[in-house]
Curated annotation (Swiss-Prot):
Gene3D superfamilies: Hexapeptide repeat proteins, Spore Coat Polysaccharide Biosynthesis Protein SpsA, Chain A. It catalyses: alpha-D-glucose 1-phosphate + ATP + H(+) = ADP-alpha-D-glucose + diphosphate. This is Glucose-1-phosphate adenylyltransferase large subunit, chloroplastic/amyloplastic. Heterotetramer. Insensitive to 3'phosphoglycerate and orthophosphate. This protein plays a role in synthesis of starch. It catalyzes the synthesis of the activated glycosyl donor, ADP-glucose from Glc-1-P and ATP. Belongs to the bacterial/plant glucose-1-phosphate adenylyltransferase family.
Amino acid sequence: RASPPSESRAPLRAPQRSATRQHQARQGPRRMCNGGRGPPYWTAGVTSAPARQTPLFSGRPSGGLSDPNEVAAVILGGGTGTQLFPLTSTRATPAVPIGGCYRLIDIPMSNCFNSGINKIFVMTQFNSASLNRHIHRTYLGGGINFTDGSVEVLAATQMPGEAAGWFRGTADAWRKIIWVLEDYYKNKSIEHILILSGDQLYRMDYMELVQKHVDDNADITLSCAPVGESRASEYGLVKFDSSGRVVQFSEQPKGDDLEAMKVDTSFLNFAIDDPAKYPYIASMGVYVFKRDVLLNLLKSRYAELHDFGSEILPRALHDHNVQAYVFTDYWEDIGTIRSFFDANRALCEQPPKFEFYDPKTPFFTSPRYLPPTKSDKCRIKEAIILHGCFLRECKIEHTAFSRLNSGSELKNAMMMGADSYETEDEMSRLMSEGKVPIGVGENTKISNCIIDMNARIGRDVVISNKEGVQEADRPEEGYYIRSGIVVIQKNATIKDGTVV
């Protein structure tokens, strides 16, 4: 059992995973995760019913398994991204960099490919230029071989005569482009719709989720995870009975409503340390719908509702078979600057709570063809070194970084890199003109900071927020403070000698 990743998320045992699924080549019963020690999900009573264990697979022949060719995935990537501002001031949330060389959109995309699902739609709306560019370069420009699959970007659109404007929620986004999907489904024999978020960090075999959905003959299946009290109010919380059927759903409850959603999570003691610390089961925002059920909910039964979590799902419980799939691996919702910062910092730890590298289920991203990193007389502890870095006589700890000059020190920081290089001659010319080159200058000390792309930080700068300011807006000076973390804006310049 692993150590707790945070007080809000349960420490979970990482399962062993099979290679990318090719449905036609499957032989025998599906291998369970946790190395065969237990089921990858549990169906158990978390209301008044006694807990019981239900294995995911019962050793049926491969002919009874779900076909990934009958599944289409839709990634919701069109939110305003206000909670990740200023990182989302010029980009959509799924385009935000993570882990040194990836984008958040790479997480659900890679999970789909590794699950054998190759019919993927990405819905976009706000600040979508960089997201569209990344998707094209990575998944449409010859980088990934889809065989008979496809990736299609569905931009927000308005039909003639519509009173409303842009997408007003997750369900409304679906409703406005459903005519495109209906035309697609007619020709592709799609039976199940997988709905995903573009702002989470996790590794999941989606076909295990789909298989449970089929085995239970569910109309809707929610993927859920145990969470602690500190962040429970940020999520939609669920209760389900001994058969796994969801009996209550509450979106971001507070006060007494939050207390009422507590459950007995002792049935998860096979996977987490001290389940009592994680008394809530949260919806991950990952859903599987029967195709016809989804179309009926959006076009007829709940045609006036805009959001899945807060409006449609609580109502659908009463007249549909809504099942829960409890996910017991690492999962982090990247919904705020604090959670984004903590998730990136955790990637630097040894061993990390989440590992991007897995030869059987790799994460894909756009190739950048950068040269190897060069370093000289540096002291580095628990850090992620980006491609093509230049490091000179610097000290780095718990940091993801790029270009640093002599005497600089970074601790608990994240640098997102730059779009282009500046040569030594260009840097010398800029400094002779009193300007600041890209990267971190000499003798600069930085801690608890996120440095967005193409930032120019001068010499003898100190960024530490010693006064402990929690929130501040200083766009004219090139930075914001969110949850006590200093965020240097994209393309910002911090002049020599500045103290933040």
